[in-house]
Amino acid sequence: GYHEAHLTGTAGANGYTMDDLMQDDLGLDGIGCTACHSIDDDNLAGRSNGDLPINDENVSWGGFENPWDGLMSGQTGFIPVFGEHMRNSEVCASCHSLYTHTQDLQGEETGQVFFEQTTYLEWVNSAFNAENVQCQSCHMPLVEGGAIAATQPNWLFPQRFGKHHLVGGNAFMLKLMRDNAVQLNLSATPVQFDSTIARTVASLQHQTAHLKVRQLATSPGEWAFEVEVENLAGHKFPSGYPARLSFIEFILTGPEDDTLFHSGAWSPANGINGRDTGLEPHWNEITSPDQVQIYELVLGDVEGATTQVLERAAILLKDNRLPPRGISSQHPTY
C-alpha cells in the first residue's frame, strides 16, 4: 500500500528520519497522483488520520465516464475507471479529519483523543453539504465541455472533470518554495508557481470572506464603526492546521491622510502589533490600538498552558473561528 511504501527501510528503526526521506524515491515523490486516484469508495466519510482505502488492483479512479484505457494501462499498468466518489467531498475526509492522542508534559499518553483538524466535518455540518456544494466545487472547479487530455486519442472527451488547482490559503508557502526551488529540487517553474499563487490570492480575496464596515452615530469628536465579517467558505474560517489565523487591520485616517487609529498593524519583523504573547482574547469592542481581533484556534496542554506541540493538545483555550453558513450546534459533528 501507499503508506507502507513510505515506510520502506524503517523496520527496527526508531523512526522515519529526514536522512531516510532523502534516500527514499517514494518519499521524495510526496503526494503523487495515485495517492488520491487509488482511493476506493469504502466508508470514506467515516475515515480519518489518512486512513485511506487504497486498492491493490492497479485501478485508477477518475472523472471520465467511459475512458479509453488502452494507452494508460499499457504504459503505466494503471487501469483508468470512472469513480463517482472522486467528485464528492467524502474522498477528502480522511486527510482532513485529524485527531491526536494527547500526551502530558512527560510524553505519556493520557488516553484522551483531541480533534485537531475537522475541515471535512465542518463542511458536513454546513449548508454547503445540504446544497450539494462539494469541496471540489471550490478547490477543483469543473472544466466545462470537452478537453484533449493527450495526443492519443486526438478527439474531445465530452465529460466534465475537475481542474487540479487544489488551491488553499497558503500563498506564503508557495512563494517560499518558488524562491528556493533549486535547493528543494522542485520541477515546477516560477511561472507555474506564480499562477498558483495568483489563484490562491484570488480565492482569498473573492471566495473566502466578505467585509462590511458601517459608521455608527456618535458624539462630536468621537468615531465608532461596526465591522461585519462573513465567512464564504464551506468550513470554518480559517480551518485546518491550528496555527492558521486571520486578523483584522483597521486604520482610521484624517483629512491630511494622518493616522488617527490603527489596530492590527503588521510588520515582517514584529508580526501583529498588540498581539498578546499568550492568548489574544476575542474582542466584541476594540477601543485601543493594542487590541486586535484575531480569529484563531489556540491549543492548551494538560496544565492549561498554551502549546503549539500538536501531541500535547488537550483543551481548546480559544476558538473564535467563523463557522460556515448553516452550521448547527445540534449536529452530531459539532
Predicted regions and their residues:
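Primarily the internal scaffold of c-type cytochrome electron-transfer domains
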Residues: 8-334
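Acidic, Gly/Ser/Thr-rich repeat motifs that build Ca2+-stabilized beta-propeller blades
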Residues: 1-6
